[in-house]
């Protein structure tokens, strides 16, 4: 199936799969990509050698193009933006949520309490 003909909803999963495959292959050393010496007459060794001959330049080009992505600058920028957008005011937001939850729970408990057990303080 061609990537150009796949449905738009399938593109994220295909892209993620390709990214995973590229990162996996890029993490392998170039020694592991070179064919191991074996019987030259075997058809499978010829097929493997041909596939590696086609894939190795692609992996090298992809690794070189995506080098900026794996560098510390890209990750640091992402983490800084994420912190500023989501975590910077987490403490005050958490305190406000705990306070409102406590008040809501006390009000609900007070409304469920029988009048004989929980007399209003204004009645004496």
UniProtKB/Swiss-Prot annotation:
Signal peptide region: 1-27
Known tissue expression: Expressed by the liver and secreted in plasma.
Keywords: Glycoprotein, Lipid transport, Secreted, Signal, Transport
UniProt subcellular location: Secreted
InterPro entries (UniProt xref): APOC4
GO BP, one annotated term: lipid transport
GO CC terms of this entry: extracellular region; high-density lipoprotein particle; very-low-density lipoprotein particle
Primary location recorded for the protein, binned into one broad class: secreted
Highest taxon listed in the record's lineage: Eukaryota
List of glycosylated residues: 107
Keyword ATP-binding found: no
PANTHER family: APOLIPOPROTEIN C-IV (PTHR32288:SF0)
Entry similarity comment: Belongs to the apolipoprotein C4 family.
Function summary: May participate in lipoprotein metabolism.
UniProt protein name: Apolipoprotein C-IV
The species this protein was found in: Mus musculus
């Amino acid at each position: 199936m061609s990537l150009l003909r796949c449905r738009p909803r399938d593109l994220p999963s295909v892209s993620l799969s390709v990214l995973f495959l590229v990162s996996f292959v890029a993490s392998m050393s170039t020694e592991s990509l070179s064919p191991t010496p074996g019987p030259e007459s075997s058809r499978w060794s010829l097929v493997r050698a041909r596939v590696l001959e086609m894939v190795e330049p692609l992996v090298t080009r992809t690794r070189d193009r995506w080098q900026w992505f794996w560098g510390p600058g890209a990750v640091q920028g992402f983490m800084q933006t994420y912190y500023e957008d989501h975590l910077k005011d987490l403490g005050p937001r958490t305190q406000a949520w705990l306070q409102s939850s406590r008040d809501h729970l006390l009000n609900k408990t007070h409304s469920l309490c029988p009048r004989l057990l929980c007399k209003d303080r204004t009645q004496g």
